[in-house]
């Protein structure tokens, strides 16, 4: 089959070259137009349900809103995890779906089940779906700053809410623009309880009057002078004077009682659950641009920047927009870095080819397969919808060396056969027809084995395709693009390369002996191989012992899920205890931001505590998320690295009650979505009794702090909230003609503040709040004395119908699959994650006694690593079996297939030793490198064995038991090994040379790519060295055994 394809391609070379030209043009177009991003979208398919229940405590929100929603969503088809968050005034439910679920199908199913549960929610409470965005949709953030002092926080927030937000939402593929920080303007109707009692007016009557005085109505239309006039009765509240003139009732003598008689109307700030701060200089308002799921981040960011630039002229004087996070910077750095590495690889591979072949046109034949293979890979990427990112380009990068292997072997074999033809016909001139015939025969001779070897490299990535969840989404693009590139190289090797050889390998072909590099290789290899063939069993014993040397470094190498990717920015997410006030949170935020700005490498600090106005942010007030923009690396102090910056920040920011955590922004948001945990290691304690969960979480926190490598550990306190409980006495309330609902309505309105509508001021809408003065509700004693007007117009106090007590309770409730859960956040440093977790598990098992009904589960990146390891343990052996079958089909002998498979362990030797030497941990990235190494090592074995077989087949006496001799066998093995050392050395050299730029790279994304390249380079140093000696030695023993059997 392969022979037929080669011969038909050469026969129809014009059509093949036209097809190659078409592919190159099409591929160039796709390369230019392929969307780019920094990383693949690693987030799970999620649908967020946000429900506002203003003024309600977390326990009430959990009981009345979150619990009905989470229990219903557990039945949604395809849902694998349902997380609930109940906090003050808001409920968030995250429905996480299985991989491969269509996001819009998921939204429709959630909406369907949401309609079923809507009737179980409290009156007036309505759940809504969050934006169709992923967990990493926060692509651009900005702050509004007024350095002139002309505009306060309320003005800045209004500018964001009613101008910038709507302008930016018009940009295609922007799912949402969330406001954060600043102050929302609010009309506050502050009731004087004494004046209210004096006039005998209840709170309910005030609410009714406010509602009735803030409406507009239409009166149809009338005709005047042959024209239509629409009738409108204006009634919106627009000024404080409008509020003051609201009539509440008329006295007995007909004098109206106005709102101003019983209340003070003022403009003030709405209760805040989110605060933003810039550079430690003070509070600001800001916005977050959220990308629609699956769209092009860089294009959208560019459109956002252009839009903001055009809007600058429309901003009030003194107001400026400051960019506080811009993912396009990371995208550009990552793509530029990987593109540069690919170019370096191309150049290095070209130099290696030229040095070995010692013929420029022959080297060009091998080199041209690289851009053609790249075009094929990008064309398939385009149809699959893959974008260009660190991982997809990385797949091509690790394939570059192997892509030219087949071309190299074919070219070298063509050189050899042309040299032999000249030797056999010293007086003849090689005409065009004969040259094409020699080159075609040379291609057919090695083509099938090379095609099988490239197929083996392609199939070696099957385990990567089977990875699930986040690890599958991260390494899937790498596996796809490497597969496409290798498949393209295999196709080119049997279709295009023979044709290019026929056109370009012309004129005087320098003999192999004229190349000093080749002479050096033969001079070194020759005596060593003679010794190996003289003592084949000793050679195999030494090789087996060399494999055992990996036991020492393997025990020293730690484990992790993925290395920390340097995104160029940092996220400061300290863990704090709950119950902090808004004023204290703002003060703490400014202090930490100011300390962070003191580090010279920091360019800008955008601090956020609490949440932005979006369903994608469920942060409670005590959760700090500070985005740190760093200066370009060339502006850092000499010797500074990201690790050193984090260490200096950690030593600088030291405030009581804060457990520091420094994480990359994208990585953190991915982890929080997939596992719910913001730290690399997390422990989830689940149960039914909140007190038991709290006790266990605190015990685990104490134990965790004693484990080596744990930098910080903090358990959430479920019972850390402070409550003032109003316990209604039903009997006493009944004596005054009041129900429990009447008292609750009074507490909600007078203490919590009732939202009684909003003003309409152009396109702006501002809330109206009704409540008692601060002095009447600032202590339990003041609450007890709150006056109540009963339905029978009696004046009583709250203490007459209820007991007011101070207690503790949950500040925020979290559930996973409807079970209450507490999370312990653990940050590990100076030690690998796997070792820390193993010690943690041991310490918890020994020192923490589980209470009945509770359970402990490790989460975070460790959970993802365990899942990936489990999958690879199943799939790697299966893949080796598939490779073995392919080898058997190629050589038709079990022994020869086993011989090549046995070379794979020798590749591990160099890979593990290089990992240890470079200080890398075992991870999914290094595992990917080892899997790629297995395919390349098998390919080298195929090439080696192919030449040995050809040499033996060229000596007919070896197949005859009567003429067989060990001396002739050694001579054949010598010819197959030493005289064909050039293509083997080239195969190794181009792979190592192609990977070195990746290993030594330091730019964005190099943390992952270097760990993929390290085991491949280490393995390609030891595997070929051992295989150059082991395969001839083992093959000799195999033939000697075969000869004894024949005799």
Swiss-Prot record:
Main location: membrane
Localization, UniProt: Cell inner membrane
UniProt-recorded Gene Ontology molecular function terms: monoatomic cation transmembrane transporter activity; xenobiotic transmembrane transporter activity
Keyword hit for DNA repair: no
Subunit description: The cus efflux system is composed of CusA, CusB, CusC and CusF.
NCBIfam families tied to this protein: 2A0601
Record function comment: Part of a cation efflux system that mediates resistance to copper and silver.
Protein family per UniProt: Belongs to the resistance-nodulation-cell division (RND) (TC 2.A.6) family.
Protein name stated in the entry: Cation efflux system protein CusA
Lineage, highest ranks first: Bacteria, Pseudomonadati, Pseudomonadota, Gammaproteobacteria, Enterobacterales
